[in-house]
């Protein structure tokens, strides 16, 4: 067994993400038998001594049949209506299932804004930590009923990776309708399972498709979530929901993704992955070398233009001469102030404006 699989198998704290297709029938509505089987596997892991946070998709899918809908809606309003009905059914089903073991569940609904803003980020973290301390099973989902198109995680794979970082999990397990990562389309019969991913190079040539009829998270989103978790120092196991028992017992199935050797600090992880960017700083080639290669602070002299309106403490994207993002960082000045000092050397500026525009400690190369 690989070191990554051993880490997942022995993890004391785990986030388990369960996709819509694992919980709902093809025509919509919850499949209680499948949900109970997943709860059984999670309960077994908790009895073995691990803390488990569940990120559960399925609210929209669970709301289809009660509303007389036969397929996943395309417009946001109908999706949110289905989610409002389905979320109630989903929470009740999880509560009923875990009640068989005398466990209490707590529902935690998050929007991207809750993760992007530091104050809400910390509050969500405290809530999840407290639920864990009280031995309740946290059932996390995106708050689909209020999340706008601009304030969405995109899919629950990304949400699960962010939650894994939020709670300091030792491992992330993604359970869906696929049994791992393949080097081609497994539906065509000539694809081979990739058991281990130890570096980005292992993904060369891998083609990732889109999601299924009842979900939004295809293989591309799972790979993105695995990379995100890797930055947080969290190994990932991707497996079929039907193999949940083995996945949570000994990590002997699916594809294992290794974490990066040195994890990003909590602040730098937030800057790179969780925070919404509020604007753009365009920088010259010399500044790109200073920021990316030498890991130096960004000074006014290297800035060529400012896009957007933002304030000191906001996160911005840094674009090089080719208009490609090269880093993200927390600015020390408002956009209007930066417009006044861009291109100038530090010596030309008054003492109160001689701080770096983005300090090296608040910069994350991409």
Curated annotation (Swiss-Prot):
Family membership: Belongs to the glutamate 5-kinase family.
Record-linked PROSITE patterns: GLUTAMATE_5_KINASE (PS00902), PUA (PS50890)
GO biological process: L-proline biosynthetic process
Source superkingdom: Bacteria
Name of protein: Glutamate 5-kinase
Record's keyword terms, sorted: Amino-acid biosynthesis, ATP-binding, Cytoplasm, Kinase, Nucleotide-binding, Proline biosynthesis, Transferase
Subcellular location: Cytoplasm
Pfam families given in the database record: AA_kinase, PUA
Enzyme nomenclature, EC number: 2.7.2.11
Annotated ATP binding sites: 17, 176-177, 216-222
UniProt cross-references to NCBIfam families, sorted A to Z: proB
Natural source organism: Rhodococcus opacus (strain B4)
SMART domains: PUA
Binding sites annotated in the UniProt record for substrate: 57, 144, 156
Broadest EC class assigned to this enzyme: transferase
Involved pathway(s): Amino-acid biosynthesis; L-proline biosynthesis; L-glutamate 5-semialdehyde from L-glutamate: step 1/2
Entry's Gene Ontology cellular component terms: cytosol
Annotated InterPro entries: AceGlu_kinase-like_sf (IPR036393), Asp/Glu/Uridylate_kinase (IPR001048), Glu/AcGlu_kinase (IPR001057), Glu_5kinase (IPR011529), Glu_5kinase/COase_Synthase (IPR005715), Glutamate_5-kinase_CS (IPR019797), PUA (IPR002478), PUA-like_sf (IPR015947)
Reactions it catalyzes: L-glutamate + ATP = L-glutamyl 5-phosphate + ADP
Domain PUA: 278-352
Function (record text): Catalyzes the transfer of a phosphate group to glutamate to form L-glutamate 5-phosphate.
GO molecular function: ATP binding; glutamate 5-kinase activity; RNA binding
Coiled-coil region: none
């Amino acid at each position: 067994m690989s070191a990554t699989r051993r880490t997942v198998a022995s993890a004391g704290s785990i986030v388990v993400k369960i996709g819509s297709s694992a919980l709902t029938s093809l025509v919509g509505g919850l499949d209680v038998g499948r949900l109970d089987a997943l709860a059984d596997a999670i309960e077994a892991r908790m009895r073995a001594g691990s803390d488990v946070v569940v990120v559960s998709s399925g609210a929209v899918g669970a709301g289809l049949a009660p509303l007389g809908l036969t397929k996943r809606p395309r417009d946001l309003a109908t999706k949110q209506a289905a989610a409002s009905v389905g979320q109630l059914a989903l929470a009740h089903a999880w509560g009923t299932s875990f009640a068989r073991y005398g466990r209490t569940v707590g529902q935690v609904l998050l929007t991207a804004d809750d993760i992007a803003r530091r104050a809400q980020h910390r509050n969500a973290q405290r809530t999840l930590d407290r639920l864990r301390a009280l031995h309740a099973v946290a059932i996390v989902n995106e708050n689909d009923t209020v999340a706008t198109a601009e304030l969405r995680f995109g899919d629950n794979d990304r949400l699960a990776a962010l939650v894994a970082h939020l709670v300091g999990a030792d491992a992330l397990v993604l359970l869906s309708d696929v049994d791992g990562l393949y080097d081609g389309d497994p539906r065509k019969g000539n694809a081979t399972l990739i058991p281990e991913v130890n570096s980005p190079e292992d993904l060369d040539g891998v083609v990732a498709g889109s999601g299924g009829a009842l979900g939004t998270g295809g293989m591309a989103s799972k790979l993105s979530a695995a990379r995100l978790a890797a930055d947080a120092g969290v190994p990932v196991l991707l497996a079929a929901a039907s193999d949940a028992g083995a996945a949570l017992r000994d990590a002997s199935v699916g594809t294992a993704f290794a974490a990066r050797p040195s994890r990003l600090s909590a602040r730098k992880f937030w800057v790179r992955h969780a925070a919404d960017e509020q604007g753009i700083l365009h920088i010259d080639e010399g500044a790109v070398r200073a920021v990316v290669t030498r890991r130096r602070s960004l000074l006014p002299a290297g800035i060529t233009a400012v896009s957007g309106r933002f304030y000191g403490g906001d996160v911005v994207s840094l674009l090089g001469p080719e208009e490609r993002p090269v880093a993200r960082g927390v600015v020390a000045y408002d956009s209007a102030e930066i417009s006044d000092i861009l291109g100038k050397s530090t010596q030309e500026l008054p003492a109160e404006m001689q701080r770096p525009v983005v300090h090296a400690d608040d910069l994350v190369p991409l």
